[in-house]
């Protein structure tokens, strides 16, 4: 990239800092922007600035929002006794897009990972305890995934809820063999969970 004109090189280098974009892809995007009308490029730049300036973290659920509290937390028609715990905001979006769940959410901001130095203090566990202490939540739904870190986080939450809030029902998303898969190709852990959480017919 050293042979590129300075402004083009700088834009390509900045774009390459985004996850999933390598130097070549970043350069292609920069060249595409160079071909666009000035107003469109200015619009893209302004929208990126607005992204940082006009969004905030909801004080109740820790999701990304442009209003505080967010639209979900402000909705009185939601089921107050259900709280769905997700690791990141995009998980909340995925669940919300299905339109099946009508309770509230809390975004943890990640998963516990001792190897990476992520402890309960780095996540929204204090906010979780504040929500549970109010006494409105009757069911806590863990929608954290099926990774090793998700299992560690679920175990930590289970121990906390059982010791401090024994009246709260704890559930998690069902896990098992995906639709369209065959048993013989399923990994051992997925197969174990499928057997453990088997359903009656």
UniProtKB/Swiss-Prot annotation:
| Signal peptide feature range | none
Name of the protein this chain belongs to: Recombination protein RecR
What gene is this protein translated from? recR
One BP annotation, GO: DNA recombination
| Keyword Zinc-finger in record | yes
GO molecular function terms listed in the Swiss-Prot or TrEMBL record: DNA binding; zinc ion binding
- Family listed: Belongs to the RecR family.
The free-text function statement in the UniProt record for this protein reads: May play a role in DNA repair. It seems to be involved in an RecBC-independent recombinational process of DNA repair. It may act with RecF and RecO.
Q: Which domain of life is it from?
A: Bacteria
Keywords, ordered alphabetically = DNA damage, DNA recombination, DNA repair, Metal-binding, Zinc, Zinc-finger
Zn-finger segments (C4-type): 58-73
- Which InterPro entries does the record associate with it? DNA_Rcmb_RecR, Rcmb_RecR, TOPRIM_dom, TOPRIM_RecR
The protein's matches in CDD domains, at most eight in alphabetical order, are given as: TOPRIM_recR
Toprim domain sequence ranges: 81-178
Keyword Cell wall biogenesis/degradation present in the record's keywords: the answer is no
């Amino acid at each position: 990239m050293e042979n590129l004109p300075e402004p083009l090189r700088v834009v390509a280098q900045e774009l390459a800092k985004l996850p999933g974009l390598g130097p070549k892809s970043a350069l292609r995007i920069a060249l595409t922007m160079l071909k666009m009308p000035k107003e469109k490029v200015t619009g893209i730049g302004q929208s990126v600035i607005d992204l940082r300036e006009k969004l905030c973290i909801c004080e109740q659920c820790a999701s990304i929002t442009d209003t505080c509290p967010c639209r979900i937390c402000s909705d009185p028609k939601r089921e107050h006794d259900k709280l769905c715990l997700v690791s990141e905001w995009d998980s909340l979006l995925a669940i919300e897009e299905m339109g099946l769940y009508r309770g509230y959410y809390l975004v943890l901001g990640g998963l516990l990972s001792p190897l990476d130095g992520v402890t309960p203090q780095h996540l929204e566990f204090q906010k979780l305890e504040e929500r549970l202490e109010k006494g409105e939540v009757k069911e806590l739904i863990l929608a954290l995934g099926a990774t090793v870190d998700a299992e560690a986080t679920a175990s930590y939450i289970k121990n906390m809820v059982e010791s401090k809030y024994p009246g709260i029902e704890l559930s998690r998303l069902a896990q098992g063999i995906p639709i369209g898969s065959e048993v013989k190709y399923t990994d051992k852990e997925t197969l174990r969970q499928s057997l453990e959480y088997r359903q009656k017919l």
